[in-house]
Amino acid sequence: MPHAQCPMPNPMLTTPKHPQEPVLFVIIRLLRWHKPEGRLILMIPALWAVFLAASGKPPLPLVGVIILGTLATSAVGCVVNDLWDRDIDPQVERTRDRPLASRALSVKVGIVVAIVSLLCAAVLAFYLNPLSFWLCVAAVPVILLYPGAKRVFPVPQLVLSIAWGFGVLISWSAVTQNISQPTWLLWGATVLWTLGFDTVYAMSDKEDDRRIGVNSSALFLVIMPL
């Protein structure tokens, strides 16, 4: 697979569609909070875990921490992904209007937003028990490095699925203070669920990814012999 080529972005593709948009609204788009359904990919499995581990009756404060934690974590993932791909996204129809790709926000602002989001997630992690806290720490490098996987790994969506699967491990252990066989079964189901969801999502970028020279599970399934 050839290395990703990153030519100078076409000005016609990087002109913002929202030139008068307030900075706050641009940051909301950077965080993907204008598309809340995407946050559910991480939140739903995490809530599965906390409710199953607590036999349907988890402490409400813990549920709140899990919900806020998934929002903060998904925000980190989205911003870091856009920072990695700021020179690739302008070449993709679906992503060319993202704030960093369209230059509606600077890289410096993107880094600040990523750090603030990560700090918010860290503050919430301190509420958890030691096992859950260290699982949070272990998830960070996977989340930060996932966007680079599409440059070297044929199925980068699997890396994202593993990263989001940490939500199950963290939530379950936050209730039980351990990880048991059912935890791993739920984790495996979550990885497969996320992989399937994100592969369908990647189908719309398949031709752009092939042209640019980046990997995706959508392309992998096309070239994989049956």
Predicted regions and their residues:
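Small-residue-rich segments of transmembrane alpha-helices in multi-pass membrane proteins
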Residues: 40-49, 160-173, 220-223
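Transit-peptide-like, low-complexity N-terminal presequences
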Residues: 9-29
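Alpha-helical membrane-protein architecture signal
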Residues: 24, 64, 116, 184, ...
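Intramembrane alpha-helical segments
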Residues: 28-29, 68, 76, 98-181, ...
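Membrane-embedded alpha-helical segments that form the functional core of polytopic membrane enzymes
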Residues: 46-84, 94, 118-122, 133-144, ...
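Solvent-exposed interhelical
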Residues: 69-122, 191-226
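Arg/Gly-rich low-complexity intrinsically disordered repeat tracts
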Residues: 1-11
